[in-house]
A protein has these predicted regions:
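N-terminal export signals
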Residues: 1-12
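A cross-kingdom marker for long, charged
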Residues: 13-78, 85-132, 136-392
Length: 392
């Protein structure tokens, strides 16, 4: 693995040795995760081990990606030659699949902590052009809460606001495929572009804690609507519907199934099917899906929701955990074209502060959004593009 660990701290000799040893351990853990996670070629998340064909087509979306392309070119122009060599990858590179939520993962590209103020603003310009205002602010708040975690955990070396890396895959183009990846603790964005089409999955957003009650960013709080709207969805079901939707009323651990290096998970539909809901409940489920999709820019959110709507009847809602106002829980929304997971996780970096470190908590949340059936990272669109336009 070619990436280096960025260390934003000045050490004494013994402290420096400890950090060096830890960095080497993290490098080895990262390499092992990659070797195991990338052992199989990409297929995509499926319900039965086989990709459902013809779900995704190369077709004009009617929403311009020129602002994203211009912002990417501005960011690239801001980098030095050395930085550029670390940041640029081919569009079909395995780098797309090299992401992990954990803070120890050794990442590729250039970190925000290494950037000048101008470079960092150019990076944020790329993100603002690609995301909705809501999506950008959520991502920034994940970063801010990683600073809060650094304060609480006493670890400014491997945790912090600027320990997030950016890579560019392919050359920004109006016609050729390209994209970018943003990667760090509790925030991973994969953003693929082909013409005016966009695929923004896998997407991972989370935090521990989800609310800052002290420190530099006191008052920052995230993922409450995702939590509350999911709970509202299950509470609004009839008793009979709830019995079908809830897979287990007991939640004892972490339940997400499609996080890092889980690109080929076989995950059958479970829970309650939207076709069996009332119109009002189906609209509520759609609004829950849109809450996640709308982290993308507004125009491409509409395009993706049109795709979601075409499969709304075959969209499933599943639940694990209690359904009370203070319950910890997991829910999943799954259709042929979208997969969303929300999970209250066990304490991790803050386990020593927890009354029960083995019990899932509302202060540690993981959210994942995927495009099943082979189009995570825009892989199916890229496949179709190469069939139509063979590359050397």
């Amino acid at each position: 693995m070619a990436a280096a660990v960025f260390v934003p701290h000045v050490f004494g000799q013994s402290e420096k040795q400890t950090s060096t040893d830890l960095a080497e351990r993290f490098r080895q853990m990262s390499e092992q995760a990659e070797q195991e996670g990338l052992a199989s070629p990409f297929l995509g998340i499926t319900t039965n081990g086989k990709v459902t064909p013809d779900l995704f087509q190369i077709s004009p979306s009617g929403v311009s990606t020129e602002p994203v392309r211009n912002a990417a070119e501005k960011f690239i122009a801001s980098l030095t030659g050395v930085q550029l060599a670390r940041t640029m990858f081919p569009v079909d590179d395995a780098q797309w699949r090299k992401w992990m939520n954990q803070h120890f993962y050794v990442r590729q590209g250039i970190s925000l902590g290494e950037m000048t103020d101008a470079q960092r603003e150019a990076a944020f310009g790329l993100m603002r052009a690609s995301l909705s205002a809501k999506g950008f602010e959520l991502t920034r708040n994940v970063m801010r809460l990683n600073e809060t975690l650094a304060e609480l955990a006493g670890d400014p070396v491997f945790l912090g606001e600027w320990l997030y890396w950016i890579t560019i895959l392919g050359k920004p183009s109006a016609t050729e495929p390209w994209g970018w990846q943003f990667s760090g603790h509790h925030a991973i964005i994969n953003y693929f572009v082909l013409g005016d089409q966009v695929v923004m999955t896998p997407l991972f957003l989370g935090s521990e804690p989800v609310r800052a009650t002290s420190g530099k960013y006191k008052g920052v709080e995230i993922l409450q609507q995702e939590q509350n709207d999911g709970l509202g969805m299950v509470q609004a079901l009839t008793d009979a519907q709830r019995q079908r939707a809830v897979l287990n009323f007991s939640k004892t651990g972490n339940n997400n199934l499609t996080e890092a290096f889980k690109d080929n998970v076989v995950l059958d539909y479970a829970g309650l099917r939207a076709k069996d809901l009332t119109d009002a409940a189906r609209r509520r489920l759609r609004e829950l899906v849109q809450l996640y999709v709308s982290n993308m820019d507004d125009g491409h959110t509409r395009v993706k929701m049109d795709e979601v709507d075409r499969h709304i009847g075959n969209t499933w809602f599943a639940w694990i955990g209690g359904t009370q106002a203070d319950s910890a829980f997991y829910y999943r929304v799954q259709s042929p074209v979208i997969l969303i997971e929300f999970d209250h996780q066990r304490p991790a970096n803050l386990a020593r502060f927890a009354s029960d470190p083995d019990k899932p908590t509302r202060q540690h949340i993981h959210c994942v959004v995927r495009t099943p059936n082979g189009n995570d990272y825009g892989k199916d669109l890229l496949r179709q593009h190469y069939l139509a336009h063979p590359h050397a």
